[in-house]
Amino acid sequence: MPLSRLIINNFRNLQSLDLELSPNFNFIVGHNGSGKTSLLEAIFYLGHGRSFKSHISNRIIHYQAEDFVLHARIDEGQHQWSVGIQKKRSGDTLLKINGEDGNKISDLAHLLPMQVITPEGLTLLNGGPTFRRAFLDWGLFHQYTEFYSCWANLKRLLKQRNAALHQVRSYAELKPWDIELAKLAEIVSQMRASYAEGLRPEIEKTCQFFLPELEIGVSFHQGWEKGTDYAEILAQGFERDKAMGYTMIGPQKADFRFRANGLPVEDVLSRGQLKLLMCALRLAQGEYLVAQKERQCLFLIDDFASELDPIKRELLAHRLRESGSQVFVTAITKDQLNQMQWQESEQDSLFQVQQGMLTK
């Protein structure tokens, strides 16, 4: 679903922009601090209701304004959507889809599936399991309509159980939570396992394209011993959980692990190889979405040239162009975009950014 138009008001140093966008590649060139990453951040905010750089909304609102407003037009074949989001310094948020209020962030996220590739994105590989669960759950959200409600209810029950652990004296008092929690945990884990197994061949194929010298393996770990009953584990671990004050075992501990030639990737790959593997994983997931749901996702790539040599940049550009996705790419200079051959395509757009102002 490509964005055909983007309006930004008072988002960081971007005070007033109205952009007509290419459905193919959109290149954003500018010096550090010019506002090029803020443009990607604004697009991300439209699809997630949050920033990928800051959790404090007042830091995102322009210092001279009381709110920021983002608006976009989304085109998909014969269908068109108008989406908008306003965030005030007070913390209030207003969402609109086709002019109607009462929408949720999940509604925006469903309309705008997107993958983000940033220098900080290596946490997918060398960070904690939280980042890899988020990777899996992104795919589940877009593939299974029932996943979001199951996941949200699971989070709610875990929070309630953890609070109850500080109050109950016996397991009998906690058991009503555990009955429902165990059911949801099994459902979410089964969806995660099924999705991970379906995604695995796509990951292996894409990694072979980018890193043919390595054998990349993936494995899903549900967060408790496979083949055991989660309800029994909760009951057996009651005293331990009560002493710790939280639920130690379960789907909230799930992981999706990556190995290179049988070893953890974070232990054996260089920074450049990790960056390429991260790109491969994001591309594989986007292509799997197309294969399963016939839906394209956007790709937001910040600092395209970072830690990739010219040959690897060409490989990434080739694969992105083959995907047919809408892509937004930032770079400091035009020369860094040579591997993407932007000069040869009249269907691409090139924007120059300087002090929050864009010229095409």
From Swiss-Prot:
It is found in: Cytoplasm. PROSITE patterns: RECF_1 (PS00617), RECF_2 (PS00618). Pfam families: SMC_N. Its main location: cytoplasm. SUPFAM superfamilies: P-loop containing nucleoside triphosphate hydrolases. GO terms for biological process: DNA replication; DNA synthesis involved in DNA repair; double-strand break repair; SOS response. ATP binds at residues 30-37. GO terms for molecular function: ATP binding; single-stranded DNA binding. One of its GO terms (cellular component) is cytoplasm. InterPro entries: DNA-binding_RecF, DNA-binding_RecF_CS, P-loop_NTPase, RecF/RecN/SMC_N, RecF_2. Keywords: ATP-binding, Cytoplasm, DNA damage, DNA repair, DNA replication, DNA-binding, Nucleotide-binding, SOS response. Gene3D superfamilies: P-loop containing nucleotide triphosphate hydrolases, RecF/RecN/SMC, N-terminal domain. It comes from the Bacteria. The RecF protein is involved in DNA metabolism; it is required for DNA replication and normal SOS inducibility. RecF binds preferentially to single-stranded, linear DNA. It also seems to bind ATP. Belongs to the RecF family. This is DNA replication and repair protein RecF. It comes from Actinobacillus pleuropneumoniae.
